[in-house]
Amino acid sequence: MILLISDLHLQEERPDISRAFLDLLDGRARHAKALYILGDFFEAWIGDDAMTPFQQSICQAMRRLSDSGTAIYLMHGNRDFLIGQAFCDAAGCTLLSDPSVIELGGEQVLLMHGDTLCTRDLGYMKMRRLLRNPLSLWILRHLPLSSRYKLARKLRSESRTQTRMKSTEIVDVTPEEVPKVMAAHGVRTLVHGHTHRPAIHKLMVDGQPARRIVLGDWDRRGWALQVDEQGFQLAPFEFS
């Protein structure tokens, strides 16, 4: 069994989500061969050198799962792209490139966070290119902690404001971009998060039937994609 999740947006202000994640680690994930986390794992991450006690507790829980034999793979999201190798080493997880193609359920599957599919959101795409530039990443990681905290708060506030102002079409994936990206990677299944619109979409790629599986965000309930001998099963679950 393989589990895939995304968009938990873990933060101290939402202990219900944190407890649900810890329950997953102590429960279903213990029986999984691997757990994939496809971005926006944390609501914000300003650097491995600034881990709070809350973030350290999450890191330690992940390490316990990793030590038990479940492989953990973590992909950057737009909220936590400053997660680095130090955190991954401590948590016992592997940092996964976005995009990545893996074998899943007997086929090649493309994994993405999903933000790069939203090409109609021109303002966001411009900001993403700026922030993900290697020079920008170096500067961000070397800013004083106080400056990083202020910048993180500013970016989160602006993101919420912009999301409310933009149409749903702009902040969703661009329909034409999906088959183009899937064809470029030679896959018929794509799994991503980011949009907070869980669903399984059918489409055609190079004249062949394909599917796009969108993981759900964790808010009032959690979401997970389970891949086993029964196939690909996307389903929500209630927080205990």
From Swiss-Prot:
Cofactor binding mode and count: Binds 2 Mn(2+) ions per subunit in a binuclear metal center.
UniProt-listed Enzyme Commission number(s): 3.6.1.54
GO CC annotation terms, alphabetical: cytoplasm; extrinsic component of plasma membrane
Binding site for Mn(2+) 1: D7, H9, D40, H196
GO biological process: lipid A biosynthetic process
Catalysis performed (reactions): UDP-2-N,3-O-bis[(3R)-3-hydroxytetradecanoyl]-alpha-D-glucosamine + H2O = 2-N,3-O-bis[(3R)-3-hydroxytetradecanoyl]-alpha-D-glucosaminyl 1-phosphate + UMP + 2 H(+)
GO molecular function, a single term: manganese ion binding
Subcellular location, record wording: Cell inner membrane
Membrane-topology annotation of the record: Peripheral membrane protein
Principal localisation: membrane
Cofactor: Mn(2+)
Pathway assigned in UniProt: Glycolipid biosynthesis; lipid IV(A) biosynthesis; lipid IV(A) from (3R)-3-hydroxytetradecanoyl-[acyl-carrier-protein] and UDP-N-acetyl-alpha-D-glucosamine: step 4/6
Binding site for substrate: N78, R79, D121, S159, T163, K166, H194
Gene3D superfamilies tied to this protein: 3.60.21.10
Entry keyword set: Cell inner membrane, Cell membrane, Hydrolase, Lipid A biosynthesis, Lipid biosynthesis, Lipid metabolism, Manganese, Membrane, Metal-binding
Binding site for Mn(2+) 2: D40, N78, H113, H194
InterPro entries in UniProt: Calcineurin-like_PHP_ApaH, LpxH-like, Metallo-depent_PP-like, UDP-diacylglucosamine_Hdrlase
Family: Belongs to the LpxH family.
NCBIfam families (alphabetical): lipid_A_lpxH, PRK05340.1
Matches recorded under HAMAP family: LpxH
Protein name: UDP-2,3-diacylglucosamine hydrolase
Organism of this sequence: Pseudomonas putida (strain GB-1)
